[in-house]
Amino acid sequence: MKFYHAIISFLAVFLAACNSNPLQPHSGGRLFEALVVGDTNNIVGKALDTDMIALPQSEPCFDVSSVSHKAFNNTLQLSRNIVVVNLNHTRYHGVKITYEKDVYAHPQIVVSINAPSVTSLSQALNGHQGQLLRQLLERSELNFTISQLRNKRNTRQEAAIKKAFGIILQVPVDMTSSRQGRNFLWLSNNSATAMQNLVIYKLKGKPLQQAGKNMTDTFTSLRDSVMKSNIKGETNAMYMQTVALPVNVNMIHERNKKLIIFRGLWEVKGDAMGGPFVSHVIEHKGNTLVVEAFVFAPGKKKRNYLRQLEAALYTLKQQ
């Protein structure tokens, strides 16, 4: 597992560092949409439209469209995320996944999957290579979202974060509402239909490092304590808390530092509000810093709203 995380961390740097060719046309497509070329029996499509974890309703990791090699014309070549499947039992002796950047347009990633047979392709994508494919496309799309954020930032809120916590974080331009507490800052676009929120808070010491196998329970308890004090409903008896479902945890290395990622669902005690959250946890100057995104969008799909904010979390830099 560490091997795959290392690959994805490397790809994040590589994809962000490559310069686009200004002579190429601009790519298109909705966020987290992928075009699959030459898919047989929808094998790649099934690997990509696996449910994204920790959402309140079923939503796929990617919205997938599929075309044949013959139908892959000049217009479709402008898609931002392309997966090309090549099956040939004499030419390929195993399943291999490779990628190129900005082949037909920019920004763009074109992933090639070469396999000797439908059976070998299916077996590979049901295992680690399916996970690798999703992570590769997810990180490429997050990098695209980060590039969009760079030109539409709220520098006033970024300055407030830097002053309060000593970190650099890119903040979406529409995050105009804020509330500050003790070692706590809440930013929001305050939308009535799709409210996107960023929360930054500091925990004294390194409680997760000491928690061992109980790290998820420890984080949930600490998170609930912070949210109960800082994010309340109409009365003091109403406050944000973590939904009592398994919270997903993942550890990776980002910029040579350990990053712990928690995903789960939140709700307001005593109210009908809730949605997904994702928290990035790092050690910072002897303490623990949590940078979290959460979404409230009743009646709407949540994936892209959360992914947009998750891209912002990856811009965090320590001073």
Mark where each language-model region is:
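Secretory pathway targeting signatures of secreted, lumenal, and periplasmic proteins
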Residues: P22, L35, P172-I231, E267-V268
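C-terminal motif of bacterial Sec signal peptides marking the signal peptidase cleavage site
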Residues: F14-A17
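Signature of long, low-cysteine stretches enriched in small and polar/charged residues
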Residues: V67-S120, M227-T288, K300-K302
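Soluble non-cytosolic domains of exported or imported proteins
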Residues: D39-I43, T119, Q123, D217, ...
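A surface/extracellular/periplasmic glyco- and lipid-processing/surface-interacting theme
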Residues: L136-I167, V173-D174
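Start-of-domain marker
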Residues: S20-Q108, A124
